[in-house]
Design a protein with these regions (language model features):
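Domain-level signal for soluble alpha/beta catalytic cores
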Residues: 1-385
Length: 385
């Protein structure tokens, strides 16, 4: 895995804005509506090539495919894993929400049309009712082939493909088959190992997306911190099981606090889970760090030593706002981290994927350009050139 040995490198967390025509086909595919599969396949390949070039043009060093073949976490998991049925929950059942603790203080916000994260009650959900198996071989092969084609003739520092952690899949696909949480999460880990290995065997960096690690705290609003740490540790152990034969230097780990637009008043503090994050078998750790609830947590690294050989990728541009971060503010953030963990151990990242979370694709590209300029300013301060 590349490091910032000569300058601060720039990357991002994954999801990028899909072209409108591709997005319409993804929605049709997700909803089992008719769409032309050949047109979709051709457009997906051309769109991935376009978004790779766009990332390079904006100054991104470590690029991905924009996750263009995926509509949502739930659809992605359904496409890659077998063993699930889709049905409505019981009439009185309200699925746990990633803002469960905030909901107690702000029910009016979450139940209003003005609240951007709205409480749902009767949406269809997925339930595991037979043994899980991996069925995503064709889908991940398509991801790999499209990305490989897009990288031909272009120059990047590195390339990554994201895949979802077992614990995050567990949130969306509920267990009705396995005897307990441990058996279920480890079954998910065994299945997802096939995708993780396929990505690394293709020569790409594997990014593990795991918002579960932090947003599970709000989902399980009845738990104390100590109870939640046990809950999270089991899921990290399962993830490490899935990564056990994959070289750590080929893995980057991304976590955030759920990425919903809302108060985030009761997000679990980074200091309560940072040691768990560092247990993950990865070389780099991408952590939400630029928004008003978590920006102050750079100070956690005054007390916590980043392990030798690891890389920290703090979010220096956010997905919660359409504000374009000033390059000087981005540089300040990067320099703070570099002074604590070493300049070669820091890369510029985003809080989460910007794909569907900012108001317009041009906002995403402007944020990327600001990150690249901020990294140049930070490099000048840290290297004197």
């Amino acid at each position: 895995m590349k490091r910032s040995t000569e300058r601060i490198l720039v990357t991002h967390a994954g999801s990028l804005p899909r072209p409108e025509d591709l997005w319409e086909m993804l929605i049709a595919k997700s909803n089992d509506r008719p769409y032309d599969r050949e047109i979709f396949a051709r457009r997906l390949r051309s769109a991935v090539a376009e978004v790779v070039k766009k990332q390079i043009d904006c100054g991104i060093d470590i690029v991905n495919d924009g996750e263009f073949g995926k509509h949502s976490f739930s659809d992605y998991a359904r496409e890659r894993l077998g063993g699930y049925v889709e049905r409505a929950p019981d009439p009185d059942e309200r699925p746990p929400a990633i803002f469960g603790r905030d909901l107690v203080d702000f029910p009016e916000y979450f139940n209003s049309k003005g609240g951007r994260a709205v409480v749902g009650r009767h949406a269809l959900r997925f339930f595991c009712n037979v043994p899980i198996k991996y069925i995503g071989h064709a889908a991940v092969k398509t991801d790999i082939e499209n990305f490989t084609a897009a990288l031909q003739g272009v120059k990047v520092e590195e390339a990554f493909l994201p895949a979802v952690a077992p614990g995050t899949i567990e949130h969306r696909l509920k267990n009705e088959y396995y005897p307990n949480d441990e058996a279920y999460v480890y079954a998910l880990a065994d299945a997802m190992h096939e995708e993780y290995k396929a990505i690394v065997d293709a020569g790409f960096i594997l990014q593990i997306d795991d918002p579960d690690l932090a947003d599970g705290w709000q989902l399980n609003s009845h738990m104390s911190v100590s109870e939640y740490r046990k809950f999270a540790e089991l899921r990290i152990d399962a993830l490490n099981h899935a990564l056990s034969d994959i070289p750590q230097e080929r893995v980057r780990f991304h976590m955030c606090w759920g990425s919903y637009h809302g108060p985030h008043k009761y997000d679990i503090p980074l200091r309560d889970i940072v040691d768990l994050i560092l247990k993950v078998r990865a070389e780099s750790y991408s952590i939400e760090a630029s928004n008003p609830r978590h920006e102050h947590e750079w100070r956690v690294w005054e007390e916590v030593k980043l392990p030798e050989g690891k890389v920290l990728v703090p979010g220096v541009a956010g997905h919660y706002s359409d504000f374009i971060e000033h390059p000087e503010a981005i540089a300040e953030r990067l320099v703070k981290y570099a002074k604590l963990v070493g300049r070669e151990n820091v890369m510029a990242g985003t809080d989460c994927g910007l794909g569907t979370r900012v108001g317009h694709p041009k906002i995403t590209w402007a944020k990327f350009e600001a990150m690249a300029e901020g990294a140049r300013l930070a490099t000048k301060q840290l290297w004197g050139r």
